[in-house]
C-alpha cells in the first residue's frame, strides 16, 4: 500500500506542474480565423479543442481569402477589431494618457494562433505618410510599409507602433517565458497554423501534441555555405553556432559546410531538425518523392522570400517543408535583409530550453513590424519532455535518448565519449552512434579517427540510405586526408565541390543575392548583437 501511495505522489508531482503550464498557455491564447473560409473556421475549432482553448477565445474576422491584403484592409478588418475585442473583454488593460492615446499596462493574452485562411502579408502602400526614420536606419528599411500580418500583430500593442519601417523587438534574445515576463504588456506572439492544404495543418497540430509526450528525437542536418568574410558571414555564423548548440545538447548532427545546398543524392534519414541556406526554392534531397521529416520536426531554410506564399508545395521553402512533414518553421514574406531574419541559433537554443515555438520564434527576431512569420502550433514545445523528470521504466527504447545521455555525461562533448559510444554501438548494433561521432571528429579536423568511425559504422549499418551516406562521408574524409589520390573521383561519388558546379549551368535561384546595395550599415544598426 505504501508503494502504491508513493507512486501516486510521484505521478502527481510530475503531472500537476505540466497540466498547470498547459492551462496557463491555453488561457493566454487567442485563435483567429477567416469567417469567409469554411476550412479556416473548422481548423480553428479543431485546434482549440486539441489545446483546450476556451471557445470565447476563438474569434472570426470578415476577411478576403487572398494571402496578400492592403494596409487599409489590415487596419480596418484586422487590427481595429482585434484591438477593440482585447480591450472590451478585459484581455488588455489600458490607461488613457494625457495626449489622448492609450497604453497597454497589463495583459491576459500573449499568444495568437492564426489559422490557414487568415491573410499572410500586407502590400506596400506608397500613399501612406511615413514617420521620420529612426537615427541610423537607411531608407531601404525605414521607407517601407509592407510587412507580414503576423509581425504587425506582434507590434500593434506597443507604444511606438507605426505603419512604416521596423520596430526593435523588446523580446529579442530574452530567456524568460512570456507569461513570466514583465516586458511590454502590449507585445503579442503570433504563430501561423498554415500549409498548402488543411489536412497538412491538422497533421501539424496532431504531430506537435504527440511529439511533446516523448520529445523530438532524431538527426539534425545543418547546411552552411563556407562563408568566412563579407556581408553574409552572419548567416554562416548562425549555422556554425547551431552545430555547437545541437551537439552540446546531445543531438547527432551532420554539418555540410560546402557552398552548395545538400545535393539531391545525399541521403537524409530520421530528420528531426534541419537548418540551411541559401536557395530560392526547395531543392536537393527534399525534392525526393519519398522524403519525409520525422513527426514534429523543426525545419528552417533561410531565404528572403521563404514564406512569400504558403499555398504551394513546390515553391519557396516554408510551404514545401510543411508538406514534407515538418511541424514548425520560420520564414519571411518580403525582403527582410539578413540582420533582420531570425537568429537561428537563438531560436534552436530557446526551443531546447523548453519554451514554446511562438516564444522561441520571436525571441530570435531583432525586429517586429517587419517581414517575419513563425509557422506551427504557437504552444508547441518540442523539447519539454527533455526537461522533465520521468520514470525510466516507462520509457520506450530510444537510441537517440541514449546518445544524448552519453553526450551529457561527457561534459557535453561527444569527442570525449569514444568509449561509451563504442559500448552503445556494440550493445545496440546501431550505426548512428559511430556516424555521429565521426561527423563531430571530421568537423574538428580529427580526420583519421573520423575515417575509422565511418568505416566501423558502415560495417553494421542496415539501412541502404544510411550505408550510402556513410560511403559519401568516407569518400569525403579520404579526399581530405589524401587529395592527390582522389583527383579523378566523380562528384556523384562524394560531396559536390565548388569546382564541379562552376563547369555547369547554375540555377539562378541558387546564386548568392546581388550586393547592389551596400550592407555595411546593417552591421552597425542599434540592435543587440549576439
Residue ranges with predicted function:
Residues 476-491:
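Alpha-helical linker/edge segments of TPR/alpha-solenoid repeat scaffolds
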Residues 17-21:
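Sec/Tat signal peptide C-region and signal peptidase I cleavage site
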Residues 5-15:
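Bacterial N-terminal signal peptides
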Residues 423-425, 457, 464, 493-496:
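Alpha-helical solenoid scaffolds that mediate protein-protein interactions
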Residues 506-530:
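Long, low-complexity, intrinsically disordered segments
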Residues 432, 462-470, 497-503:
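Boundary/linker segments of alpha-helical solenoid repeat arrays
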Residues 22-432, 439, 443-448:
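Cysteine-dependent hydrolase recognition
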Amino acid at each position: 500500500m505504501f508503494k502504491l501511495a508513493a507512486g501516486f505522489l510521484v505521478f502527481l508531482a510530475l503531472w500537476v506542474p505540466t497540466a498547470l503550464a498547459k492551462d496557463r498557455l491555453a488561457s493566454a491564447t487567442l485563435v483567429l480565423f477567416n469567417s469567409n473560409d469554411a476550412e479556416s473556421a473548422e481548423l480553428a475549432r479543431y485546434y482549440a479543442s486539441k489545446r483546450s482553448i476556451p471557445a470565447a477565445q476563438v474569434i472570426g474576422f470578415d476577411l478576403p481569402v487572398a494571402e496578400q491584403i492592403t494596409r487599409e484592409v489590415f487596419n480596418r478588418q484586422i487590427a481595429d477589431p482585434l484591438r477593440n475585442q482585447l480591450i472590451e473583454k478585459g484581455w488588455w488593460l489600458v490607461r488613457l494618457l494625457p495626449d489622448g492615446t492609450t497604453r497597454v499596462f497589463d495583459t491576459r493574452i500573449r499568444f495568437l494562433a492564426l489559422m490557414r485562411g487568415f491573410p499572410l502579408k500586407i502590400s506596400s502602400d506608397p500613399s501612406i505618410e511615413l514617420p521620420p526614420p529612426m537615427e541610423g536606419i537607411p531608407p531601404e528599411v525605414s521607407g517601407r510599409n509592407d510587412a507580414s500580418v503576423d509581425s504587425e500583430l506582434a507590434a500593434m500593442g506597443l507604444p511606438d507602433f507605426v505603419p512604416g519601417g521596423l520596430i526593435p523587438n523588446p523580446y529579442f534574445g530574452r530567456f524568460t517565458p512570456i507569461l513570466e515576463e514583465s516586458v511590454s504588456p502590449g507585445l503579442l506572439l503570433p504563430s501561423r497554423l498554415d500549409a498548402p492544404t488543411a489536412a497538412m495543418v491538422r497533421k501539424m497540430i496532431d504531430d506537435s501534441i504527440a511529439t511533446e509526450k516523448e520529445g523530438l528525437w532524431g538527426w539534425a542536418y545543418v547546411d552552411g555555405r563556407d562563408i568566412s568574410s563579407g556581408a553574409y558571414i552572419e548567416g554562416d555564423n548562425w549555422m556554425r553556432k547551431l552545430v555547437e548548440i545541437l551537439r552540446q545538447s546531445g543531438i547527432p548532427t551532420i554539418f555540410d559546410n560546402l557552398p552548395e545546398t545538400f545535393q539531391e543524392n545525399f541521403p537524409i534519414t530520421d530528420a528531426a531538425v534541419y537548418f540551411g541556406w541559401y536557395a530560392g526554392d526547395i531543392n536537393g534531397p527534399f525534392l525526393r518523392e519519398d522524403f519525409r521529416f520525422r513527426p514534429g520536426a523543426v525545419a528552417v531554410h533561410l531565404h528572403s522570400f521563404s514564406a512569400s506564399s504558403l499555398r504551394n508545395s513546390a515553391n519557396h521553402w516554408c510551404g514545401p517543408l510543411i508538406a514534407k512533414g515538418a511541424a514548425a518553421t520560420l520564414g519571411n514574406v518580403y525582403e527582410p535583409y539578413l540582420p533582420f531574419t531570425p537568429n537561428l541559433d537563438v531560436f534552436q537554443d530557446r526551443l531546447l530550453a523548453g519554451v514554446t515555438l511562438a516564444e522561441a520564434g520571436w525571441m530570435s527576431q531583432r525586429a517586429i513590424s517587419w517581414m517575419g512569420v513563425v509557422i506551427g502550433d504557437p504552444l508547441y514545445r518540442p523539447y519539454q519532455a527533455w526537461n522533465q523528470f520521468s520514470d525510466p521504466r516507462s520509457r520506450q527504447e530510444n537510441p537517440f535518448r541514449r546518445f544524448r545521455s552519453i553526450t551529457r555525461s561527457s561534459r557535453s562533448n561527444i569527442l570525449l565519449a569514444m568509449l561509451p559510444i563504442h559500448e552503445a554501438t556494440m550493445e545496440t548494433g546501431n550505426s548512428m552512434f559511430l556516424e555521429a561521432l565521426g561527423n563531430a571528429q571530421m568537423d574538428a579536423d580529427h580526420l583519421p579517427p573520423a575515417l575509422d568511425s565511418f568505416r566501423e559504422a558502415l560495417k553494421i549499418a542496415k539501412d541502404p540510405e544510411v550505408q550510402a551516406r556513410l560511403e559519401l562521408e568516407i569518400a569525403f574524409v579520404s579526399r581530405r586526408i589524401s587529395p592527390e589520390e582522389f583527383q579523378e573521383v566523380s562528384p556523384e561519388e562524394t560531396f559536390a565541390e565548388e569546382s564541379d558546379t562552376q563547369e555547369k549551368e547554375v540555377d539562378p535561384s541558387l546564386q548568392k543575392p546581388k550586393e547592389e546595395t551596400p550592407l555595411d550599415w546593417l552591421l552597425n544598426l542599434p540592435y543587440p548583437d549576439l
